[in-house]
């Protein structure tokens, strides 16, 4: 879809270019990435606003407001019949975009069913839409989502102008073959602030003392408590780890609908005293330092930002083989089958007990994961787009 080369009042008189970003404002990988990008933008020229789909206060809301963002809500929470919520939200998004004269949208997508939201934005007058794939599978999604995605996937090139995938796998999952084969899609690494996440022994001692982890072998994980992240299997793995070495702790960051169920399972497995359900943290760069190994047995991922953050902090990482191997950036990463028993996983988790942590900053810089590179890509794209609208 070509943009007509005209000027719009919205971008005249040296106004700041506003890009509307879809992202929940909880503590999650994509949200953290967008905020890190925003922190590295020249906000006298370009800034982000956020579109959320639930009318509630969220952990990172105050942070984005302090960066000069506006928060827009397009909620269907009051619609009791779930199948109607997606239809209702189309109109809510249309109204938000029309009322606020939104011209540019950066849509962080999980699957092609998200096209209903993009259609709402288009109906609201949005002229330029980037769709950014962050997922590589449906996981536990119902047949309804799969069916809607199959129907709407061919419409993506009709409504969107720019196509990003956080990995090649994520791009192939979301976009039609025509987009992939024509070369219109780009892989954009999930950049992070490498200096902020770099291994720091002093911070490690500080956080381990604060959390009473001194002398412990800390198995860490960060992710929303949802089916996709596979916390149930993670607890099984840790039970095996703890049985082999009682001087171990499982440190979990995140919130979500399955959190209470996982607390109950930890009690059932008899490991509740060795599992810390920390909840959300806006200081994950420090929290990574306290861990000794990162374990991620997800059922599917695009390219997990948390996996990049963990490696940037010098952590060994054990991923499931359902995660793209593109995330394996450092030498201390491995991928295990979800069909393997927890005891096998436990052996791999424990083998890193004597690994000496070190900075991995140069390796991640060379791989393109410096947040400033990502921010520069965003700025160049949207400043050029704004000139043509």
Feature-to-residue mapping (PLM):
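N-terminal strand-loop element at the rim of the active site
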Residues: 5-11, 20-28, 32-88, 257, ...
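A conserved mid-protein helix/loop that constitutes part of the nucleotide-sugar donor-binding site
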Residues: 28-36, 217, 221-243, 257-263
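Acidic anion/phosphate-binding donor-loop and adjacent secondary structure
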Residues: 82-84, 172-179, 183-184, 189-210, ...
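Aromatic "clamp/platform" in nucleotide-sugar-dependent glycosyltransferases that forms part
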Residues: 110, 280, 299
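Active-site donor-binding acidic/aromatic loop of nucleotide-activated sugar
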Residues: 258-261, 272-281, 287
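Short hydrophobic beta-strand element within catalytic cores of glycosyltransferases
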Residues: 316-320, 325
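A charged, aromatic-enriched C-terminal amphipathic alpha-helix characteristic of glycosyltransferases
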Residues: 356-389
